[in-house]
Regions:
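Catalytic cysteine-centered active loop of the rhodanese-like fold, especially the PTP/DSP P-loop
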Residues: 77, 81-123
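Conserved beta-strand scaffold positions in the cores of enzyme catalytic domains, especially
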Residues: 31-33, 51, 68-70, 116-118
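Extracytoplasmic
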Residues: 46-47, 55, 63-66, 86-90, ...
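N-terminal, post-signal-peptide region of Sec/Tat-exported proteins
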Residues: 54-78
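Flexible, polar/low-complexity N-terminal or interdomain linker segments that lie immediately upstream
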Residues: 2-50, 54-62
């Protein structure tokens, strides 16, 4: 019985560690969480992508990734359709610590975007 409990606990831990994706229950589209290094590789090798900075105006003004578009996470729902017309476009999302980029990525998925990669914060 102890072995079964141990296996269940290990399984739950594994699922929680590897299940870091947002899922839209209707269409099972997810965003991918990537590292900052993976995001940099994409920026260095790909041509057709958009970078979303999910921070505030003030944070953006203090410094941001070159060519990033400022759409604070709390404005994604109202601005995405207009500013991001191609829902299949590769979109890289970041913020300061990673919390807002996750929220923004989840919202993009809910809005129907299919190629969202979230790379956390830039602290």
């Amino acid at each position: 019985m102890k072995k079964v409990k141990g296996l269940i606990i290990m399984l739950l831990i594994s699922l929680s560690l590897f299940g870091i994706t947002a899922c839209d229950g209707e269409n099972n589209v997810t965003y991918e969480q990537i590292t900052a290094e993976q995001a940099k590789t994409i920026m260095d090798t790909e041509k057709d992508y958009i970078i979303i900075d999910a921070r505030t105006d003030e944070e953006f003004a203090e410094g941001h990734i070159e060519n990033a578009i400022l759409i604070p996470e709390y404005e994604i729902a109202e601005r995405a359709e207009k500013e991001l017309p191609d829902k299949e476009q590769l979109i890289l999302v970041y913020c300061r610590s990673g919390r807002r980029s996750k929220i923004a990525s989840e919202e993009l998925v809910k809005l129907g975007y299919t190629n969202v990669k979230e790379f956390g914060g830039i602290i």
